[in-house]
Amino acid sequence: MKYCKNCLIPSTKPHITFNDEGVCSACLSYLNRPNIDWKKREDLFLKIVDQVKKDKKKNNWDCVVPVSGGKDSTYQALKLRELGLNPLCVTSTTCDLSELGKKNIENLKQQGFDYIEFTSNPKVRKKLNRIGLEMIGDISWPEHISINTIPINVAVKFGINLI
């Protein structure tokens, strides 16, 4: 097993890569931040938002926001609404959502966001957790998969082009 020379992340982390010097892709991405033209990225984002507004279909929602209950996804939903979009908030329930996370999700609902929550069968989740632990070394692997796939499935099902 390899470990990153900077942060010690192990090579068992899914999708992690290492350069020839033994530095992981996450650290390389972080180190590249000063080279990002943030104004250009903001302009590109606003152009996407404008295009979504122009292409508005009969669909009620303009975009899907994967919501975890944390501050980042809450901010994203609020910011998108501020920019004039109507997001559909989607959660793939985890078995360890904190009380604060639950409160943040309730807060979004109280503010009028449409919200869909997917919860897996507890018996199936238990089996998948075991498989994740034994085969990948990550008991939360099934949650990672659902967090990344459920919002995409919802977007496809409802014909929403922006996630």
What is the meaning of each model-derived region?
Residues 3-163:
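ATP-dependent adenylation/nucleotidyltransferase module used to activate substrates
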